[in-house]
Amino acid sequence: EMCIRDSVFTDYVDDDYLKSFNETAKQFNTSIIVYLIDPKYFADLPTSQFWSYATYFRVLSFEYLSESISTLLYLDADVVCKGSLKPLTEIIFKDEFAAVIPDNDSTQEACAKRLNIPEMNGRYFNAGVIYVNLKKWHEANLTPYLLKLLRGETKYGSLKYLDQDALNIAFNMNNIYLGKDFDTIYTLKNELHDRSHRKFQQTITDKTVLIHYTGITKPWHSWAGYPSASYFNIAREQSPWKKYPLKEARTVAEMQKQYKHLFAHGEYIKGITSLIKYKLKK
């Protein structure tokens, strides 16, 4: 039986959250270590409309944990486990930096062209799911180079996808490449164009291991009540976190998505109310 230790890197935690983490650890017979991060350490690094400073928790986790463990399965917060992770435990690293999953085909070509690395087309990975060889990471001492990349101090200039670009450049395609079942990218925006709400089954299949919910609308939003989000809800209902309500829209971008999805659900009065709030906030 494999021993698992979970690590959570966050910039916010309170007593209720810590209590829920403790309850989760007891329920699933695991250990959960919570690392509280001060955002000031990322003040000189770039952010964007879609990428906040929280994206740098990824590199921080690699650097910090490489002092004590040899491998790490990193998951973005919007990744949900649907299948068995056992195949990852059977990976034996040689000199590779990580086991990764190629990004969507359209992203592949665009990123290879943008970074002027033609051979990266087909091997540019999505950083939402990375099984990292921390022993190799530690030996290579990558963090100083990554910081230069992130600050735009290399020939690559400013990076559109921030640390995802930087990791792709630094790893230089020295990776084990896995099938997309380990990072099945799905956006709930698709539901706005699929009134049957069943087409997701063409993407999320019986073979899918990890679902990566990209985009503004996440499964934990109150307006995301679709069958495609059920995998998150199943996990939520089996955990202490079910006591917390689903998230409401707070940002302008979330409000815009909320009213559109409410209309898709046929909740027209709520949708109109949400639309008015969006217009006023905008």
Question: In which residue ranges do the predicted regions lie?
Answer:
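A glycosyltransferase accessory/donor-loop signature
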Residues: 136-282
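A short acidic, often aromatic-flanked loop/helix-cap motif at beta-alpha or helix-coil junctions
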Residues: 38-45, 106, 183-187
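Short, surface-exposed amphipathic charged segments that create phosphate/polyanion-binding patches used
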Residues: 45-54, 112-117, 192-197
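Active-site-proximal specificity loops/subdomain of glycosyltransferases
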Residues: 16-64
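GT-A fold catalytic core of metal-dependent nucleotide-sugar glycosyltransferases
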Residues: 34-40, 54-109, 124-132, 138-140
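A short, conserved beta-to-alpha structural element at the edge of catalytic cores
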Residues: 98-119, 221, 225-229, 241, ...
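Short, small-residue-biased leader/transition segments that mark boundaries at the very start
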Residues: 1-4
